Amino acid sequence: FAFLAFPSLDLPMNENVRRNDYRAAAAPMKQPGETLTSMGLAPLTIAAATLGNTTDTARWLKDNISNDMLKPPFNVRTETPHNNTGYFLTGSAGFVQSLMYGLTGLRIEAAGLVQAYPPVLPPGWKSLTLTNITFRGEHYDITVARDASGTPRLHREPR
């Protein structure tokens, strides 16, 4: 099963199709006892955030940093909570993509790093700051913070 909404594809579609795509992919992962992979959690997080579904966004992020995904003594990321394969770089990159593409709503386009979707923050989060993000030779600090009304807003500052 492939996400049509995954950032590298991000095919044009109306919100109803995007929501159905997410539901079809997420439903099996929400079943009790389902073993999630650290890489599989990234597209779920991004798709939920793209839809503005903060509850599922928070769930997938939490699952990606808990459920024994990080193994002692150095907190290395494994592919699943039940193995000890050592450092799983793809899963770690997926987690970073969850933050970069999911929570910020940014996408890489020909015009540069553009805000394609509204930013989101999981319930209870006040802000998220990604520092020294380098894109096409430029350096940025990217922050998603709640405004006075509680709505997440994206701020990009050159370094």
Region spans (language model):
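Non-catalytic C-terminal accessory modules of carbohydrate-active enzymes
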Residues: 55-159
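Active-site core of glycosidic bond-cleaving carbohydrate-active enzymes
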Residues: 1-98, 102
